């Protein structure tokens, strides 16, 4: 399941409550073509990797979170463990997304 993040507080809360689990954050926008293309794959990964926390941040709805995380383009995927960023890449690259998850779990 992918959790939709709608505030800076909800983002921090989600990172904190994840504990030891890997957190994957998809920074996207409704008007972004590549974001729409990879979204179903991101959701399917959330079903496949039940021990990983998947979050989705709409950069237009949560500009403060996107700014704090220094997101420059969409889609950007960031990976967190114990509240610390441990990885990041931009672009709708399905293979890289799944490979990065496997590398970090």
Curated annotation (Swiss-Prot):
The record marks 26 as: Deprotonates C-terminal active site Cys. Erythrocytes. The keyword Acetylation applies. Participates in various redox reactions through the reversible oxidation of its active center dithiol to a disulfide and catalyzes dithiol-disulfide exchange reactions. Plays a role in the reversible S-nitrosylation of cysteine residues in target proteins, and thereby contributes to the response to intracellular nitric oxide. Nitrosylates the active site Cys of CASP3 in response to nitric oxide (NO), and thereby inhibits caspase-3 activity. Disulfide bonds join 32-35. In the fully reduced protein, both Cys-69 and Cys-73 are nitrosylated in response to nitric oxide (NO). When two disulfide bonds are present in the protein, only Cys-73 is nitrosylated. Cys-73 can serve as donor for nitrosylation of target proteins. One of its GO terms (molecular function) is protein-disulfide reductase activity. Belongs to the thioredoxin family. The modification S-nitrosocysteine is found at residues 62, 69, 73. The lineage of its organism: Eukaryota, Metazoa, Chordata, Craniata, Vertebrata. Pfam families: Thioredoxin. Its main location: nucleus. CDD domains: TRX_family. The record marks 33-34 as: Contributes to redox potential value. The gene is TXN. The modification N6-succinyllysine is found at residues 8, 94. Homodimer; disulfide-linked. Interacts with TXNIP through the redox-active site. Interacts with MAP3K5 and CASP3. Interacts with APEX1; the interaction stimulates the FOS/JUN AP-1 DNA-binding activity in a redox-dependent manner. The modification N6-acetyllysine is found at residues 3, 39, 94. GO terms for biological process: positive regulation of DNA binding; response to radiation. The active site is at 32 (nucleophile), 35 (nucleophile). It comes from the Eukaryota. Residues 2-105 form the Thioredoxin domain. GO terms for cellular component: cytoplasm; extracellular region; nucleus. Keywords: Acetylation, Activator, Cytoplasm, Disulfide bond, Electron transport, Nucleus, Redox-active center, S-nitrosylation, Secreted, Transcription, Transcription regulation, Transport. It is found in: Nucleus; Cytoplasm; Secreted. This is Thioredoxin.
């Amino acid at each position: 399941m992918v959790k939709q993040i709608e505030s800076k507080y909800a983002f921090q809360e989600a990172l904190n409550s994840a504990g030891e689990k890997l957190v994957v954050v998809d920074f996207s926008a409704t008007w972004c073509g590549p974001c729409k293309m990879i979204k179903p794959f991101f959701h399917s990964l959330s079903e496949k990797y039940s021990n990983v926390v998947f979050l989705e941040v709409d950069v237009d709805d949560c500009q403060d979170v996107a700014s704090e995380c220094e997101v420059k383009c969409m889609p950007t995927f960031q990976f967190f463990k114990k509240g610390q960023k441990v990885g990041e890449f931009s672009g709708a690259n399905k293979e890289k997304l799944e490979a990065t998850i496997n590398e970090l779990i």
